[in-house]
Swiss-Prot record:
Belongs to the TMEM185 family. It comes from Dictyostelium discoideum (Social amoeba). Residues 463-472 have a biased composition (Acidic residues). InterPro entries: TM_Fragile-X-F-assoc (IPR019396). This is Transmembrane protein 185-like. Residues 1-151, 455-490 are annotated as: Disordered. It comes from the Eukaryota. The lineage of its organism: Eukaryota, Amoebozoa, Evosea, Eumycetozoa, Dictyostelia. Residues 133-145 have a biased composition (Gly residues). Residues 47-59, 109-125 have a biased composition (Polar residues). Residues 1-31, 66-80, 89-108 have a biased composition (Low complexity).
């Protein structure tokens, strides 16, 4: 009879374990009692011992789960309760499995929490931080929201860059108009002062006035003063490259010294024409050298892929400087040598380079005029500005021809008649200045994208440096708070 009881107990325990195969690998499977018999009495397991087959798992990853498992793992001490059928054992095992699954879910919740330092938010892998859903159920939504936020961030950055580019273009357009208005004002001052000075020279040569040279050159002083004031203009400094500014300052300084040397030469006759022309040679030579430097620097040293506007700016500024210096420097040298008698050549030979310059300038202006007639609305320069340049070059050619006839051919030409082409050219200069002031050209160096990107980079760097400390503090505080909430919930 005792043997039958023992065999029935063993069969009951084995059937209970085999009926739940999913519980074989779970910790709850260790709670199933194993019975042995000594002298016909079943032996009870000591659940407090570690060596017992039914030892309970009390901690998992530092989380106490002993309350849930120990509550349902207690067995009845009576023999009849211990002998319960397989259904009661299965119920106990299912309860243990449910408790362990709950503990595993809590562990997954704890492991699924991720702190996103860049956004200063506590996000879970399974979805929002309010639900704290673990596992892969909410993974798709989380990744979708992250990618959408990333796309929104990129779109916002593109919009900010476009807005910054529009601001820079508007600022460049405004500065461009101010620049050309200042240039127009300077041309008006130079033209009016030149007209007055030309009239004074004609009257002085014909003997109508007998003034001192220091008084006679007062209009020239006005021109130099306006040129000096233009060097301090912020608008001119921002839109014109440093090479043009340097050449302008050197030219103003050289012309000032040349005027002083001219007055000293004609009034006191202390030195010859060669010494008087030294400031002009210095000015024209510096223009020529800086033109070569700007052209070579833009071609060789400036990267056209990263900064194409900068490369174009150096090349465009270098070409007219090179052209002007190459025309004026040999003419100044030959004129100085002829006036001192060191070079026996006609004045027509000395003016060859000047004629070449006038012809090139006239052709360039004429072709611009032809192109502008077909597209008046989109043309860079207006028709009046181009016509003014053409008439100025024509008057310059006529004046040089009359001067050659008066000196080389020994023709008796009245001084006022000789100076008429100069007066007409100076009048067109005034007209061109007025036109530039009223209708500024559409010549804009479009570097708005580079300026916008540089401004955005500077703004981002400053904002990141300011908010770095606040980000660290807020992240640590949020991490501590969420950890405390999680531990209290568990």
């Amino acid at each position: 009879m005792i043997e039958n009881e023992n065999t029935s107990l063993l069969s009951t325990s084995s059937s209970s374990t085999s009926s739940s195969p999913n519980n074989a690998n779970s910790p709850s499977s260790l709670n199933i009692g194993i019975s042995n018999s000594e002298n016909g009495t079943p032996r009870k397991d000591n659940t407090s011992g570690n060596n017992s087959p039914s030892a309970q798992i009390t901690k998992y990853n530092g989380i106490d789960i002993s309350n849930n498992s120990s509550r349902n793992s207690s067995r009845p001490n009576s023999r009849s309760g211990y002998r319960g059928d397989s259904s009661s054992n299965n119920n106990n095992n299912n309860n243990n499995n449910n408790n362990n699954n709950n503990n595993n879910n809590n562990i997954n919740k704890h492991n699924s929490i991720v702190y996103n330092k860049s956004n200063n938010k506590l996000n879970s892998i399974g979805g929002s931080n309010n639900d704290l859903q673990g596992g892969g159920g909410g993974n798709g939504n989380g990744n979708g929201n992250g990618s959408s936020k990333y796309k929104i961030g990129i779109n916002n950055k593109d919009v900010e860059e476009k807005i910054e580019i529009k601001k820079q273009k508007k600022m460049n357009r405004t500065n461009n108009q101010k620049f050309w208005r200042i240039v127009g004002s300077i041309l008006q001052i130079i033209g009016l002062s030149s007209i007055v000075f030309t009239i004074f020279i004609g009257l002085y040569i014909d003997g109508y006035i007998d003034w001192s040279y220091w008084i006679l050159f007062i209009p020239v002083y006005v021109i130099l003063a306006a040129s000096y004031l233009a060097t301090g203009s912020r608008v001119l400094s921002n839109l014109v490259s440093w090479i043009i500014r340097l050449v302008w300052r050197l030219s103003v300084f050289g012309l000032t010294v040349f005027v002083v040397f001219t007055i000293i030469h004609f009034k006191y006759n202390t030195f010859g024409f060669s010494v008087m022309m030294i400031p002009l040679l210095f000015t024209f030579g510096s223009v020529f050298v800086m033109g070569i430097f700007s052209l070579l620097f833009g071609i060789i040293f400036v990267d056209g892929k990263s900064t194409p506007q900068r490369k174009t700016k150096y090349i465009v500024n270098g070409l007219p400087l090179l052209f002007t210096g190459a025309i004026l420097t040999p003419a100044a040298i030959m004129i100085a040598l002829k006036l001192d008698g060191l070079y026996d050549a006609k004045l027509a030979v000395c003016f060859v380079s000047l004629f070449i310059g006038d012809i090139i300038a006239s052709c360039f202006s004429f072709f611009l005029l032809i192109f502008s007639l077909g597209s008046k609305d989109t043309a860079t320069f207006s028709i009046g500005q181009l016509l003014s340049i053409i008439f100025i070059t024509i008057c310059s050619i006529v004046f040089k021809v009359l001067l050659i006839l008066a000196t080389d051919q020994q023709h008796n030409i009245n001084s006022l008649f000789l100076l008429i082409p100069l007066l007409v050219a100076e009048a067109f200069m005034v007209f061109c200045g007025i036109n530039l002031f009223l209708r500024p050209p559409r010549v804009i160096v479009d570097n708005s994208e580079e300026l916008a990107k540089s401004n955005m980079i500077n703004n981002q760097d400053s904002s990141e440096s300011e908010s770095d400390d606040e980000t660290e503090v807020s992240f640590k505080d949020r991490e501590d708070e969420e950890s405390e909430k999680l531990i209290s919930n568990l």
